[in-house]
Amino acid sequence: MNYLKSGLACILVSSMWAAFALVASFYGWWMSPVVETGDAAGFSQFTREQLARKNQGNSAFLVIENGEVFDSGYFSAVGANPVDAETMFSLASMSKWVTAIGVMLLVEQGKLDLDKPVNHYLTRWKLPDHEFSNPVLVRHLLSHTSGLEDGLGFGDYDLDEDLPTLEESLAEPRASGSQGVRFVISVEPGTEFNYSGGGYLILQLLIEEVSGIGFVDFIQQQIFDPLNMQRSTFVYSQNDSNTSPSFDVNGEVAISYKYAVAAATGLSASASDLGRLSLAMMPANRSHLTRVSENMRVPAGLMFGLPLWGLGEILYAETNLGDFVYGHDGANEPAINTALRINPDTNDAIIVLVTGHKRLATYIGYEWVLWQTGYPDVLSTNLVISSSVRPMLIGLFLIVASFLFHGWFTRPTMNHLGTRVI
């Protein structure tokens, strides 16, 4: 009976330790930054080494410290044109962040209400009826909580193909795989986070309907021109002489495609221009974009009750002052990966643009967030869980060993008369 009780106690304590080790990993307990806190030069050097060693394609990075550009670096594939501060990269889903800024500017101008149904503003196309009681609001589309289920499967277009109109893309979107893509509301709007590229195609239409001009022109007039972002465009840019081609993971030039879903994935921009935009969004700038940025950081998309998404941007980790490190990442085939992170507490930021590696920009962004805050970011779940394995196993070994030793030294023995002694 004593052995059974000890065994059950060992299982209980082991389970409690394993759960604690796992939960603690999400608070960064088992992780260490790659350089000391405050060592911006050290982190820049780490970024340089990572890009030089791990990526065979093109890449660029820019580090902002205390509201000023601190460092930058540019790396070119063998035989490729040199990359510089003005080289445009395809940003993939980071495009959504800029689109969301455009939507929030319309809110700032009083032309759009986040809490009105999106169909209230649409005339050229409307979201189909659904079975749920809540309408799809503008804020739902921004925060991926609209209930839309579109499979993320929007296909690319060959360079010799004509792009469909916005209405054609909404009515008959091209799928990237064998599964068709349709706009279906499958969950009660406003109740669950479900990443939706299609929601940003609807926001593209919303911007056009509310502003009265084309999406590309609106972003150009409202964001790019005021910030002197001359190396940013939602128009296909591969004909530009200083646009990076797409590379695969082996450093070979890959086929370039066009995107019909401009608002979700069609932006190309330089590291220098993204630096200008990041600086304009920071508290130190005290501009209308600073107010927009503050409104975008309000948690709107939750997972397991924890803040994951604001109004168009990722909330990577909580800062020391209770705000959020924010920004957006992007990824596309064959090996496009981009990352942008801003810490409003310190007016620091990092921008990493990569073509030739599927996850390197996101990894560097994760290390930057850990270095800035001591917490892992929300995109690093695999790294977080992996960090808990070693302390979990060490703890389990010590727990089991303790119970075994206790059982050994408290086991019944026989005295010289043959009587059991406890």
Place the predicted regions along the sequence by residue.
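Catalytic loop of the DD-peptidase/beta-lactamase superfamily, centered on the K-T-G motif
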Residues: N2-Y74, I255-I422
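Active-site-proximal loop and beta-strand segments within enzyme catalytic domains
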Residues: W17-G28, D71, G79-S196, A361
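Extracytoplasmic/periplasmic, Sec-exported soluble proteins
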Residues: V35-G42, R53-N55, S59, V83-V98, ...
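Extracytoplasmic/secreted proteins, especially bacterial periplasmic and envelope-associated proteins
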Residues: G42, F46, S93, V98, ...
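Short, solvent-exposed turn/loop segments enriched in Gly/Ser/Thr/Pro and often Arg
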Residues: E65, V69, V118, F234-S241
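Surface-exposed beta-strand edges and their flanking turn/coil or helix-capping segments
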Residues: D84-M88, M104, L127, D156, ...
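Short, surface-exposed loop or secondary-structure junction motifs
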Residues: H130-G327, E333
